[in-house]
Regions:
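Bacterial N-terminal signal peptides that target proteins for export
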Residues: 22-48
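Low-complexity, intrinsically disordered or signal/transmembrane-proximal segments
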Residues: 4, 9, 16, 24-25, ...
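Serine/threonine-rich, low-complexity intrinsically disordered segments
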Residues: 7, 14-15, 33, 42
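Noncatalytic regulatory segments and standalone regulatory/sensor domains
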Residues: 60-63, 181-261
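C-terminal motif of bacterial Sec signal peptides marking the signal peptidase cleavage site
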Residues: 55-58
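Active-site-adjacent substructure of cysteine-protease-like catalytic cores
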Residues: 137-190
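Generic short N-terminal amphipathic or hydrophobic helices
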Residues: 11-12, 30, 39, 53
Length: 261
């Protein structure tokens, strides 16, 4: 008959062997767990660093050294506002600029001088032409945001064109820049149906450049712009003279001569 009696020494060896295997497997599990969590933590740290860098880029300031010399916040609350989307808001914006110079007018009264409807493709040129016919200087500005804000800080609203709409559909729209907040990095526009329409510096600059970076002042011949460019002012005076406003053009030249002394 087979002997099924247990050998104590053999049993002890078996138990010890099983215990060693169990400890070895547990050690492997612990190593794998540490490796997994170490890898996960490393990946998480990498993502956090990347997110931080992206956030820093996204939050980078658009305030230039020129802007830092301007007041923190300006709003020209007295600029008249005419609401409307017709003809890219061109007649409304021009009426606002003329009314700001004490001209009694409305957008409807400007349709005929602007040759609307029919001359929508010449709206930019005709808006400047009509402003000159009223005896005003049309002074073009540089394609830099700080140049526009400098004029607003001096009390002069800026007539401009920017691109408005969604990513799928955009169209140019005329507007009047009436204010800004340098701390919040926002501008205020009278545009279309919106009075005091707020846009971030970055969003506005992009929309403005998409529409050609066009911006002008409509000034009395006696009103020199802030940091006036003499050559540009004289060219504006020449354009005013060619529109039949020789006396106003002469006044503009005399104003410059007095202002640069």
């Amino acid at each position: 008959m087979p002997d099924y009696t247990l050998n104590p020494q053999s049993s002890m060896i078996g138990v010890q062997a099983g215990s060693w295997v169990a400890r070895h497997q547990l050690k492997r599990v612990n190593i794998l767990s540490v490796s997994f969590y170490s890898g996960t933590a490393g990946a998480l740290r990498s993502w956090l660093v990347l997110a931080l860098l992206i956030g820093l880029v996204g939050c980078s300031s658009m305030v230039t050294p020129e802007m830092k010399r301007l007041p923190d916040r300006v709003e020209l609350t007295s600029v008249p506002f005419f609401r409307g989307n017709a003809y890219q808001s061109g007649p409304m914006v021009l009426a606002s600029m003329l009314a700001n110079q004490q001209v009694q007018t409305t957008p409807g009264l400007l349709d005929k001088p602007l040759q609307l409807p029919g001359a929508e493709d010449r709206l930019e040129q005709n808006m400047q032409k009509v402003a000159r016919e009223y005896g005003f200087m049309v002074y073009p500005l540089d394609g830099q945001l700080h140049d526009l804000l400098t004029q607003v800080s001096a009390g002069y609203p800026v007539m401009l064109r920017f691109s408005q709409g969604s990513a799928l559909w955009k169209s140019p729209r005329y507007a009047v820049l009436i204010g800004y907040n340098r701390v919040k990095e926002t501008v205020l526009l009278n545009a279309g149906m919106d009075r005091r329409y707020s846009m971030s510096f970055s969003r506005f600059t992009s929309a403005w450049k998409e529409a050609g970076s066009w911006a002008v002042l409509v000034q009395s011949p006696r009103q020199l712009p802030a940091n006036v460019d003499q050559q540009r002012w004289l060219q504006a005076a020449e354009a005013l003279s060619k529109s039949g406003q020789e006396q106003a053009a002469g006044e503009a030249k005399r104003t410059l001569a007095r202002g640069v002394k």
